[in-house]
Amino acid sequence: MNREQSGKTLVLIPARMASTRLPGKPLADICGLPMIVQVARRAAEAEVGRIVVAVDHPDVFAAVTGAGFEAIMTRVDHQSGSDRIHEALLKADPHGEAEIVINVQGDLPTIEPGPIRAALKPLENPATDIATLTVAITDEHEKTNPNVVKVVGSPLSDSRFRALYFTRATAPYGEGPLYHHIGLYAYRRKALETFVSLKPSTLEKRESLEQLRALEAGMRIDVEVVDSVPLGVDTPADLDKARRILSARV
């Protein structure tokens, strides 16, 4: 990515304190730093653009800014991460200079720079509204696990699909690989603005998958295939695993 492209890309990291399974998750210590700071560091390593953390608590704001990163206070009552990043976008970039917004989840402290950069590749096609990531499933249990969201798509190349559907079911039927969706998104700014203006859709509510709102509205989502699923920290066991992974990198 050249400097001009980097200047037009904004990385937004939503951080929410009220996690049900791991309260205070953004401030959980991982190798001497709050988890949200570790995520911001991983995003900085990708070198794709300006980084802003969208927070909903003054303690998280203090942790992020104290580590030298930019933070924006957002409302506590957002129903989704996309609503939070949209509020942060309007506050962080009121003049509309950023053309692309990457949403890196705030619970991915071990993510490598590669997948963050890969999320931008599908947006090289001007017809693509939103880009996201996927990994080929190799674990048989994942194929039937409703917590593993599958991408059903039409191949554009060996490493890219046009998404036709996202589901918790085992799909598509028949022989062939299945793909595990990774919830990291790159939006064109206009696409994000359109998305948050839409009401939750029928299939979105049925599957509890927000991205279906975009597909039902006729928006195009392209999916880049990457090598591995980044660890999402949702439980104390995940937190311990993240600590082991980052300790090994030092």
From Swiss-Prot:
One of its GO terms (cellular component) is cytosol. It catalyses: 3-deoxy-alpha-D-manno-oct-2-ulosonate + CTP = CMP-3-deoxy-beta-D-manno-octulosonate + diphosphate. Pathway: Nucleotide-sugar biosynthesis; CMP-3-deoxy-D-manno-octulosonate biosynthesis; CMP-3-deoxy-D-manno-octulosonate from 3-deoxy-D-manno-octulosonate and CTP: step 1/1; Bacterial outer membrane biogenesis; lipopolysaccharide biosynthesis. One of its GO terms (molecular function) is 3-deoxy-manno-octulosonate cytidylyltransferase activity. GO terms for biological process: CMP-keto-3-deoxy-D-manno-octulosonic acid biosynthetic process; lipopolysaccharide biosynthetic process. It is found in: Cytoplasm. It comes from the Bacteria. The keyword Lyase does not apply. Coiled coil: none annotated. InterPro entries: Cytidylyl_trans, KdsB, Nucleotide-diphossugar_trans. SUPFAM superfamilies: Nucleotide-diphospho-sugar transferases (SSF53448). The keyword Transferase applies. Activates KDO (a required 8-carbon sugar) for incorporation into bacterial lipopolysaccharide in Gram-negative bacteria. Belongs to the KdsB family. This is 3-deoxy-manno-octulosonate cytidylyltransferase. It comes from Rhizobium meliloti (strain 1021).
